[in-house]
C-alpha cells in the first residue's frame, strides 16, 4: 500500500511540475507579447511616453488588468525594452566581431552590422535615442548604462587588437560610439541611397578616429622616450 501511495504521489508531483512548467512558458509568452506590442506602436511620430497601458494590452491580446501580472507599471515595461534594445545591439556587434575574425574590414563590417540593426529594429533604436535625453531619470540612467556597456565592450576589443593602454581605447571607443549613434539617428528615416551615403561617411569618420588614436598613442610613446622639455606640445 505504501508503494502504491508513493507511486501515486510521485506521479502527482511530476504532473504538477509539468503544469507549473506550462504556466511559466505561457506567462513568458504573454510577457514577450507585451514587449513586442509596445515596440510595434513606436514610430517616428510616437514616443514611448505617449503609449497607454490599455493600448499595449489590447495589441498583445490580453485584458488591461492582466498587464500587472507581468509588469508593475508601464515604466517597468519601458525599462525592460531599453535593456532588450541594448542587449540586442551588443549581441549583433559581437557577431560582427566574429565575422571580422574570419577576415574582412573591422570598421566596414561593424558599420554594416549597425546599419542592419537600425533597418531591422528601428523602434528599438528610436527608444534608446529618445530616452537617452528624456524626462525620466530612470530611463536616462538605463540608456546610459546600456551605452556604457557598449563602450566597454568596444574598448575591450580595441585593447586586445591594438595593444594600446585602456585609457586610449576607452577614449577611442567613446568617440566612436558617439559618432555611430549620431549617424544612426540620421539613418532612421531616410531612403536606401541616403543610408548608403551615411554608411560611407561613417566608415571614413571611424577610420579617421582609429588612425588618430593610433598616431596619438605613438606620439605619447615617443615623448616618454625623449628627455622632458625637448618635445614641443602641439
From Swiss-Prot:
- Key words of the record: Cytoplasm, DNA-binding, Fatty acid biosynthesis, Fatty acid metabolism, Lipid biosynthesis, Lipid metabolism, Repressor, Transcription, Transcription regulation
The UniProt activity regulation field reads: Has been suggested to require either an unsaturated acyl carrier protein or unsaturated acyl-CoA (but not their saturated equivalents) for DNA-binding. Another group suggests that unsaturated thioesters are not essential but act instead to enhance DNA-binding.
**DNA-binding region (UniProt annotation):** 52-71
Q: Where does it localize?
A: Cytoplasm
**Segments forming domain HTH tetR-type:** 29-89
Entry GO MF terms: DNA binding; DNA-binding transcription factor activity
Q: Which Pfam families does the record cross-reference, listed alphabetically? A: TetR_C_46, TetR_N
**GO annotation, biological process:** fatty acid biosynthetic process; negative regulation of DNA-templated transcription; negative regulation of fatty acid biosynthetic process
Its Gene Ontology cellular component terms are:
cytoplasm
Q: How does it assemble?
A: Homodimer.
Other remarks? Probably part of the fabR-yijD operon.
What is the protein named?
HTH-type transcriptional repressor FabR
The protein's organism comes out as Escherichia coli (strain K12)
Amino acid at each position: 500500500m505504501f508503494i502504491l501511495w508513493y507511486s501515486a504521489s510521485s506521479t502527482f508531483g511530476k504532473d504538477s511540475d509539468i503544469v507549473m512548467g506550462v504556466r511559466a512558458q505561457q506567462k513568458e509568452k504573454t510577457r514577450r507579447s507585451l514587449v513586442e506590442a509596445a515596440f510595434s506602436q513606436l514610430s517616428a511620430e510616437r514616443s514611448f511616453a505617449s503609449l497607454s497601458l490599455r493600448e499595449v494590452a489590447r495589441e498583445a491580446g490580453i485584458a488591461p488588468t492582466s498587464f500587472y501580472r507581468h509588469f508593475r507599471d508601464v515604466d517597468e515595461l519601458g525599462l525592460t525594452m531599453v535593456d532588450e534594445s541594448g542587449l540586442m545591439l551588443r549581441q549583433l556587434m559581437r557577431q560582427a566581431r566574429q565575422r571580422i575574425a574570419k577576415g574582412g574590414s573591422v570598421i566596414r563590417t561593424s558599420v554594416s552590422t549597425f546599419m542592419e540593426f537600425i533597418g531591422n529594429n528601428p523602434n528599438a533604436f528610436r527608444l534608446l535615442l529618445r530616452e537617452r535625453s528624456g524626462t525620466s531619470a530612470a530611463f536616462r540612467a538605463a540608456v546610459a548604462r546600456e551605452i556604457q556597456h557598449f563602450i566597454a565592450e568596444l574598448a575591450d576589443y580595441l585593447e586586445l587588437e591594438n595593444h594600446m593602454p585602456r585609457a586610449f581605447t576607452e577614449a577611442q571607443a567613446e568617440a566612436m560610439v558617439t559618432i555611430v549613434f549620431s549617424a544612426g539617428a540620421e539613418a532612421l528615416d531616410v531612403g536606401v541611397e541616403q543610408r548608403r551615403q551615411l554608411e560611407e561617411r561613417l566608415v571614413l569618420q571611424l577610420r579617421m578616429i582609429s588612425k588618430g588614436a593610433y598616431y596619438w598613442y605613438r606620439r605619447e610613446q615617443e615623448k616618454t622616450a625623449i628627455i622632458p622639455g625637448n618635445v614641443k606640445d602641439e
